[in-house]
């Protein structure tokens, strides 16, 4: 895995430095939006959809934004030897906390498909080798979990003609909110193996408000113990929560970065097609951080 490969994969996903949904993902998104009713919803309902109409607005306003920010944040990791060491074993496990309609899971899956295409063209990927992906979707909203499952299965149906290397494993939904669901997450980890990527996309603020700051931090520590030694934990939060981001950064002992993602807006909403978004990101290796913390405590 080298810088040239990373540039090739990034150019495919982010041509000319602009992150875009590819045609299959646009098709899946349009289909889901078309099947949902249109009615007036509040801003909070749009951000945290609990019924079909608010899910429709979330898909229009936030899906592409969050999806492309996930890809922007993970592009370097998926072209590392650490990630290759995971996928060459034929199994990837994604824990998607605050999954919404499986936004992070879909973004990671599409990146993996793109990566393997480039590995095949370079003669690096073994012929006939497959990667099974298991998804653990965690959200308290039934409409989010149901929509996420439909979009994941729709992605595999569309991509099956050109993609034989990435196959759908299990989709497990966990309805109980984080961190009260840690016993469930531990049982899933025991049955499937350690999580390779754990994502927390735009959930720090609601989790801190609902469960309390200390419980959120302790939950993040507990998730680290469930993760693969070559895996990553990814946390994203919007630029308006700087105070919360820095508190969590100090509490878990990990620095955050302030990222820019230049994206194509989709579906188009009568605005400029291309827009820059700024957000906070944590991306870290859980096992190394645990070792550092344990050594410090000792």
Which residues make up each language-model segment?
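Conserved SAM-binding loop of SAM-dependent methyltransferases across substrates and taxa
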Residues: 101-123
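Active-site catalytic pocket residues across diverse enzymes, especially alpha/beta-hydrolases
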Residues: 77, 81, 112-116, 152, ...
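Phosphate/oxyanion-binding active-site loops and adjacent basic polyanion-contact surfaces
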Residues: 59-74, 100-108, 140-148, 212-215
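Domain-level detector for long C-terminal conserved domains
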Residues: 2-8, 142-298
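Class I SAM-dependent methyltransferase Rossmann-like catalytic core
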Residues: 44-86
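Conserved SAM-binding motif I beta-strand of class I
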Residues: 134-139
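Conserved class I S-adenosyl-L-methionine
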Residues: 90-100
């Amino acid at each position: 895995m080298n810088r040239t490969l990373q540039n090739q994969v990034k150019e495919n996903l982010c041509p000319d430095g602009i992150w875009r949904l590819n045609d299959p993902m646009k098709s899946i998104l349009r289909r889901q939006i078309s099947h949902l009713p249109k009615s007036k919803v509040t801003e909070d309902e749009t951000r945290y959809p609990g019924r079909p109409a608010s899910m429709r607005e979330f898909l229009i306003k936030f899906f592409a934004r969050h999806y492309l920010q996930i890809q922007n944040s993970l592009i370097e990791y998926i072209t590392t030897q650490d990630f290759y060491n995971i996928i060459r074993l034929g199994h990837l496990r994604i824990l998607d906390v605050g999954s919404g309609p499986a936004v992070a899971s879909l973004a990671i899956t599409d990146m993996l498909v793109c990566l393997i295409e480039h590995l095949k063209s370079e003669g690096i990927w073994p012929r006939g080798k497959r990667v099974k992906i298991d998804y653990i979707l965690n959200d308290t909203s039934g409409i989010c979990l149901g929509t996420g499952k439909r979009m994941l299965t729709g992605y595999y149906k569309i991509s099956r003609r050109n993609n034989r290397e990435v196959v759908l494993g299990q989709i497990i939904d966990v309805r109980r909110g984080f961190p009260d669901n840690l016993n469930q997450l531990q049982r899933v980890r025991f049955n499937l193996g350690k999580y390779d990527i754990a994502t927390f996309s735009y959930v720090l603020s609601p989790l801190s408000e609902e469960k309390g700051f200390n419980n959120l931090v302790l939950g993040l520590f507990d998730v680290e113990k469930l993760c693969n030694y070559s895996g990553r934990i990814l946390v994203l939060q919007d630029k308006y929560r700087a105070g919360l981001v820095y508190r969590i950064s100090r509490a878990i002992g990990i620095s955050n970065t302030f990222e820019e993602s230049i994206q194509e807006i989709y579906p188009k909403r009568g605005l400029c097609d291309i827009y820059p978004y700024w957000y906070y990101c944590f991306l870290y290796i859980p096992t190394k951080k645990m070792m550092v913390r344990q050594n410090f405590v000792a």
